[in-house]
Design a protein with these regions (language model features):
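Active-site C-terminal subdomain of aminotransferase-like
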Residues: 10-11, 186-269
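Active-site phosphate-binding strand-loop segment of PLP-dependent enzymes
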Residues: 112-167
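Conserved active-site segment immediately N-terminal to the catalytic lysine
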Residues: 174-186
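Glycine-rich phosphate-binding segment of PLP-dependent enzymes
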Residues: 5-48
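Conserved beta-loop-alpha segment that forms the PLP phosphate-binding cup at the N-terminus of a helix
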Residues: 51-84, 88-91
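Conserved C-terminal alpha-helix-loop-beta "cap" of PLP-dependent enzymes
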Residues: 90, 276-319
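Hydrophobic beta-strand scaffold residues
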Residues: 102, 158-159, 282, 316
């Protein structure tokens, strides 16, 4: 079986071997050391400020999306959400659920966010900006510098879902003044699904500390407090966190986040060159290195999916 899906992706032999091992007890100094190292490397690879923190949630990326919305935003905010597909819609649904005032920038499928579209919302009193930097459902990667400039100009709190693009595309929390970054274990981190990761700036931590959401499992204040001792409030996905540790250390020993991004970019470019003479059209205005969104011109996506799966042992996303 070969995964050519956006996630889960192919894991290394080293990561898979850890999955075969007996899961150890975790309320120990040894596991705390692993978590401290995970936090250090995540902050390094996200290019976060020295006073930023990392939270590891046992749950999918959506769990961390929900945790961020409920812990950093309130009914006193006025939020602007980029909605370019199903994951942008997820943020809309979360703000609706928690009764957080919002407006959405609704984009056509495959279309990138443009500066003139943003300009309509300039100076309109928005306090926070929420975006999936890579809208995985359509394969569109948004211009983070443009978004960052807009948020700086309007003094907006910036939340970025980088679940499918972290490590695949350039990302710089400090340079782009990002307050919250979210990612997941099963995308370019190339580990099994089950853990999502939140990187919080000092400004975001301040919001978390002032907020009192009605939740237990996704309470980031509790998660940050426990993280000070290298632990989590509740039983975490111990095995996956050990796999993440091995993967992060491997990225560091191979030259760091820049080398990893270059490698993934080269793979994306090679595939796109090879596919261009086949009967497909690319439906994204601006692609991430993580995904090549193709529309088949001579067959159904589901038929291609089934043929690759059943006859070749290759998995792709049929949607």
């Amino acid at each position: 079986m070969i995964n050519f899906t956006v996630g889960p992706v192919q894991s290394s032999e080293e990561v898979r071997k850890i999955g075969y091992e007996q899961v150890p007890y975790f309320r120990t100094s040894e596991f705390s050391d692993i978590m401290f190292e995970n936090e250090r490397l995540m902050l390094k690879f996200a290019k976060a400020d020295d006073d930023a923190r990392t939270v590891f949630i046992t749950g999918s990326g959506t769990a961390s999306m929900e945790a961020v919305i409920m812990n950093t935003l309130t009914v006193e905010d006025k939020v602007l959400i980029v909605n370019g597909g199903s994951f942008g819609q997820r943020f809309v649904d979360l703000c609706e659920m928690y009764e957080i005032p919002y407006s959405q920038i609704k984009l056509e499928t495959g279309k990138a966010l443009q500066e003139d579209t943003l300009e309509v919302y300039n100076g309109k009193g928005y306090s926070a900006f929420v975006v999936n930097v890579h809208e995985t459902s359509t394969g569109v990667h948004y211009d983070m510098k443009m978004i960052s400039d807009f948020c700086r100009k309007n003094k907006m709190f910036l939340i970025v879902d980088a679940i499918s693009s972290f490590l695949a595309d350039e990302f710089n929390m400090k340079l782009w003044n990002v307050d919250v970054m979210i990612t997941g274990s099963q995308k370019a981190l190339a580990c099994p699904p089950g853990v999502s990761i939140i990187v919080l700036s000092k400004n975001a931590i301040s919001r978390v500390e002032k907020n009192n959401p009605k939740c237990m499992y996704l309470n980031l204040k509790s998660a940050l407090k426990n993280g000070e001792r290298g632990q989590t409030p509740f039983t975490p996905a111990v095995g996956i966190l050990r796999q993440i540790n091995a993967r992060l250390k491997k990225i560091e020993s191979n030259g760091g986040v820049e080398k990893e991004t270059e490698k993934i970019a080269a793979l994306a470019e090679d595939f796109r060159k090879k596919i261009k003479d086949f009967p497909f059209e690319i439906i994204s205005d601006s692609m991430s290195n993580a995904v090549t969104p193709l529309h088949p011109l001579t067959a159904s996506a589901n038929d291609i999916f089934l043929t690759l799966k059943d006859e070749y042992g290759i998995w792709v996303c049929p949607n």
